[in-house]
Swiss-Prot record:
It catalyses: (2R)-O-phospho-3-sulfolactate + H2O = (2R)-3-sulfolactate + phosphate. GO terms for molecular function: 2-phosphosulfolactate phosphatase activity; magnesium ion binding; sulfopyruvate decarboxylase activity. This is Probable 2-phosphosulfolactate phosphatase. It is an enzyme of class 3 (hydrolase). Its EC number is 3.1.3.71. InterPro entries: ComB-like, ComB-like_sf. The gene is comB.
Length: 238
């Protein structure tokens, strides 16, 4: 197994994902939302790049069967049911529903990863389970950080390091690219995630919007066991 990291959605190129196992990470907050929604019983999550695409697909469904969720610049989209806060995706709202989702960074990373052999959804909240999944598959991995508006994101990067460290706890015989080694070392030096992500630009944006509870939730380690998979345009659990 060899592990690489792509630092933002803008840096995704086919040659780096083709025939590899991809893990998409956007801990603040798209992948945390997806994992939480499915863990709380959502039937599936379907990501879209644009608001228009999301609303167009919604026309094909019965209104009782879907939830519109997403954000632009970390703020809920007008007319949507839910924002991009994982704390909103409770069982009472999402159980047996299709979640139609569009976000600034996470959905871009997902839709640009289609050349991968398989695409999984990762975050701090399911990091241990992601590591176990990758160990069992035992194939080359690329961890794709959604980033922030095409730029490197500290929060996604340290989550990558967390997952890599969990893999190394089980199997030290893993080849890491230099950037994967760097993420691994950064996590080891910042096991208290909050003290590290406080320096991230995305943290500052969320803090300014009063999203403290979202921050606290998204940096929790391995509180959910599922590992959603993106396939044929939809995200589901096995």
């Amino acid at each position: 197994m060899k592990i690489d990291i792509i630092i933002s959605a803008d840096d995704i190129v086919e040659s780096r994902v083709r025939n590899k196992i991809a893990v998409i990470i956007d801990i603040f907050r798209a992948t945390s939302v997806i994992i939480t929604a499915l863990d709380n019983g959502a039937r599936e999550v379907i990501p879209y790049l644009t608001i228009e695409e999301t609303l167009e697909y919604a026309k094909k469904l019965s209104r009782d069967n879907y939830i519109l969720g997403g954000e632009r610049k970390a703020v809920k989209i007008e007319g949507f049911d839910l924002s991009n806060s994982p704390l909103e995706y409770i069982k009472e709202k999402v159980e047996d529903k299709t979640v139609l989702m569009t976000t600034t960074n996470g959905t871009r990373a997902l839709t640009k990863s289609m050349e991968a052999k398989r695409v999984f959804i990762g975050a701090m909240i399911n990091g241990e389970s992601v590591a176990k999944k990758l160990i069992n598959i035992n194939d080359d991995v690329v961890i794709i950080n959604a980033g922030t508006n095409g730029n490197f994101s500290m929060d996604d990067f340290i989550c990558s390091g967390y997952i890599i460290n969990r893999i190394l706890d089980v199997n030290r015989n893993i080849e890491l690219t230099d950037i994967a080694k760097t993420a691994c070392m950064i996590y080891k030096e910042n096991i208290n995630i909050l003290s590290y992500v406080r320096e991230a630009s995305h943290y500052s944006v969320m803090k300014s919007l009063g999203l403290n509870n979202d921050i606290d939730y998204c940096i929790k380690k391995s509180i959910i066991d599922i590992v959603p998979e993106y396939k044929d345009g939809k995200i589901t659990c096995e």
